[in-house]
């Protein structure tokens, strides 16, 4: 579980029986979705798919490919595992506002074209397209969330860099 899971899991655990799949020590099912189909033991009613690679600007082809390995192939591998134990009733996918490809505060709707062209955006678009088809074919309700910025304890990316900069005194106070 990454940043989102770290902040959401305590709340989910109070209401639901939660199983975590990932590569950290505290995950219930240890699997690198980018490289393998996880071995699931039970059927799940609802799946929250928040696995993803973000927070870096790729400098090499291998770094670009890593976005597709995690965000797209990881999604394909998760779905393959779910098929083995019975598909869920619903799947919630955490995507990103980057799929829209907007550089400025343009108003977007759900019908806005997906024009993101970074490896991160393209890999998330591919995952969304795969899930849309997979869920349609398997009669699974799909919800796609496209957050713009996630804030909270242990923030990563630009927000985390800004918080760390403030702690080190790199930003002046505005009063």
Role assignments for model-derived ranges:
Residues 19-38:
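Adenosine-cofactor binding site in Rossmann-like domains, unifying the SAM/SAH pocket
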Residues 66-74, 114, 118, 122-123:
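Glycine-rich NAD(P)-binding loop of the Rossmann-fold in SDR/ketoreductase-type enzymes
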Residues 76-119, 135:
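Conserved Rossmann-fold NAD(P)-dependent oxidoreductase catalytic core, especially the SDR/UDP-sugar
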Residues 117-143:
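Active-site Tyr-X1-5-Lys
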Residues 135-175:
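NAD(P)-dependent short-chain dehydrogenase/reductase
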């Amino acid at each position: 579980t990454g940043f989102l899971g770290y902040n959401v899991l305590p709340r989910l655990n109070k209401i639901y029986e939660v199983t975590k799949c990932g590569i950290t020590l505290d995950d219930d099912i240890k699997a690198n979705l980018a490289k393998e189909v996880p071995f699931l033991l039970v059927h799940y009613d609802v799946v929250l798919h928040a696995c993803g690679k973000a927070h870096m600007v790729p400098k090499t082809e291998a770094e670009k490919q890593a976005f597709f390995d995690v965000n797209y192939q990881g999604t394909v591998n998760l779905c393959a595992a779910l098929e083995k134990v019975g598909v869920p009733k619903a799947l919630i996918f955490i995507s990103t506002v980057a799929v829209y490809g907007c550089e400025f505060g343009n108003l977007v709707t759900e019908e806005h074209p997906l024009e993101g062209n970074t490896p991160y955006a393209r890999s998330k678009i591919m995952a969304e397209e795969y899930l849309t088809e997979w869920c349609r074919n398997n009669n699974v309700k799909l919800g796609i969330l496209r957050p713009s910025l996630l804030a909270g304890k242990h923030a990563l990316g630009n927000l985390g860099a800004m918080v760390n900069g403030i702690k080190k005194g790199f930003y002046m106070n505005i009063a």
